[in-house]
């Protein structure tokens, strides 16, 4: 997402940095500290970043002042990205419709299928003696979960991944001039056909359910939900999965702890999301004049809320740059906060927990490939590894 530099508000006295200059690739802890140390409000590439925890949480909790709808309207998406591109009361309606399908109780019914898929993917990788954990595990599994939730055939997985990659790359272009939009049109057609099929032949999948009932989604809303899942629900889980497996590869004692006490996997997963939220920035636009730390932001000011920065701000014993394994699940904002808190957080936890558990059962000891340096591509909107080469003894 970009902001037109010519129309950004110019506010005197605000320190300015450049996003691409932050030292994020090798160590996000250092990068976020540079941002926090610059001041409570920092201008970067047309966006005003709020860096203090209280200010970020206040913005998340007050959509009447910090609008998600305005932020996503600025993208010019032809589809309403349900529910994130709406503010209350419209957003409240969508959450009421969708929340039951992503509750722990509902997801529990899907656990056997999702667990078996995790086992199949992990066993295929474990048999090789080495793998790229991103390509072999972290990329395919979330895509299969999406297809399962929407009642779509798993054979479409590789097509879905290709469409997802192409559409995300497309969204990063400032204009569509000279850009191949074929993948976006193909994904649009694929989801449209799926919606039409569900209207004719209802199943037990989520897509079928949201298309029926007194307050069902219309076709455009269902398409927007599908697009949001593909654009925001796949790479985020992929990235968190990579971060989890990287940390385990670097920490033999942690592997032992989790194998001996699988209940601690839940603590570990929350720590990974706290430290390495894959979508670390939340965009908002002000709806009226707002004053933050003495800085007056006029209406329509583009604002970014750095979730990862406040999770590591040192304001308490657990808000550190290290994994805290004290047996407790600690509060954090890796999934956002306020009414727009991540709808799929329970699903993401389930996916991450399944992969970590099944991997440790089959590959108790593993290490990073010699000479490989764990850096993420930066600058980027989603933080995650491109590759993760692991070495271990084959269990074939």
Where is each model-derived feature located?
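Cytochrome P450
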Residues: 1-396
């Amino acid at each position: 997402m970009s902001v037109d530099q010519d129309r950004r508000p110019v506010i005197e006295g605000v320190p300015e940095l450049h996003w691409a200059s932050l030292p994020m690739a090798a160590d996000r802890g250092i990068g976020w500290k540079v941002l926090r140390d610059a001041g409570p409000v920092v201008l970067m590439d047309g966006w005003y970043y709020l860096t203090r925890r209280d200010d970020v949480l206040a913005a998340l909790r007050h959509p009447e002042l910090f609008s998600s709808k305005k932020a996503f309207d600025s993208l010019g998406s032809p589809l309403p990205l349900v529910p994130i591109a709406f503010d209350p009361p419209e957003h409240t309606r969508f959450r009421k419709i969708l929340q039951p399908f992503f509750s722990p109780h509902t997801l529990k019914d899907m656990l056997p299928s999702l667990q078996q898929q995790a086992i199949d993917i992990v066993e295929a990788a474990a048999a090789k003696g080495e793998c790229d954990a991103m390509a072999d595990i972290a990329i395919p599994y979330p895509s299969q979960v999406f297809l399962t939730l929407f009642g779509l055939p798993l054979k479409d997985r590789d097509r879905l991944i290709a469409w997802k990659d192409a559409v995300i790359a497309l969204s990063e272009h400032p204009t569509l001039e000279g850009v191949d939009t074929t993948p976006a049109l193909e994904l649009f057609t694929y989801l449209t056909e799926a919606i039409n099929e569900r209207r004719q032949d209802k199943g037990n999948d989520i897509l079928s359910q949201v298309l029926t009932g007194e307050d069902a989604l219309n076709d455009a809303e269902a398409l927007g939900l599908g697009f949001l899942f593909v654009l925001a629900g796949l790479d985020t889980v992929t990235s968190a999965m990579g971060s989890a497996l990287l940390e385990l590869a670097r920490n033999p004692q942690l592997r032992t702890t989790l194998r001996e006490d699988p209940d601690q996997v839940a603590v570990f997963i929350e720590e990974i999301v706290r430290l390495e939220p894959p979508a670390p920035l939340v965009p908002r636009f002000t709806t009226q004049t707002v004053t933050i730390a003495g800085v007056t932001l006029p209406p329509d000011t583009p604002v970014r809320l750095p979730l990862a920065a406040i999770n590591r701000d040192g304001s308490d014993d657990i808000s550190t740059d290290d994994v805290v394994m004290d047996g407790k699940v600690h509060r954090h904002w890796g999934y956002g906060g306020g009414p727009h808190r991540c709808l799929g957080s329970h699903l993401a936890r389930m996916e991450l927990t399944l992969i970590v558990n099944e991997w440790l059962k089959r590959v108790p000891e593993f290490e990073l490939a010699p000479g490989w340096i764990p850096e993420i591509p930066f600058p980027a909107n989603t933080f995650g590894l491109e590759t993760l080469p692991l070495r271990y003894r084959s269990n074939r």
